[in-house]
Amino acid sequence: MRLDFLDEFKDPYMRTPLGQGVFLAGVALGYLARFQVEGEKDLTSAPLFKQLEFGRMNMKSLKKLLARIPKLLAAYKEGMKYGGLISALAAEANGLILKGEEQELGVDGNFAFTTGFASAPTYFWKIFGKKPEGDDDTA
């Protein structure tokens, strides 16, 4: 897992363990949501997407979503090629969140989460290496 690109972010929130954890949580959940729609272009139809309150998420709701990842991965394990990578990324996000100062997400946290979620395929492959040839951006 390569996370050195996080050092390139100049945003003060993204320089904290909490900010990095929230961002990585967005990447993990965003990639998982893309699997739920299995290649469809309309990410908004993903069940996970419908549960998110973009811009109004708090730490409690984020932790609830992260706690559900193992169950979601188990439910979707058939046909999911990268479930282990999503699990590892979620574990890293959880660890960083636990290392950070306990605080509400606020504007900075919601922005970091949404950025990770919206750009999940790009950052997922930046973290785990080059996307295999011919693969789409579903898990």
Segments (PLM) and residue ranges:
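Intrinsic-disorder/low-complexity detector
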Residues: M1-A139
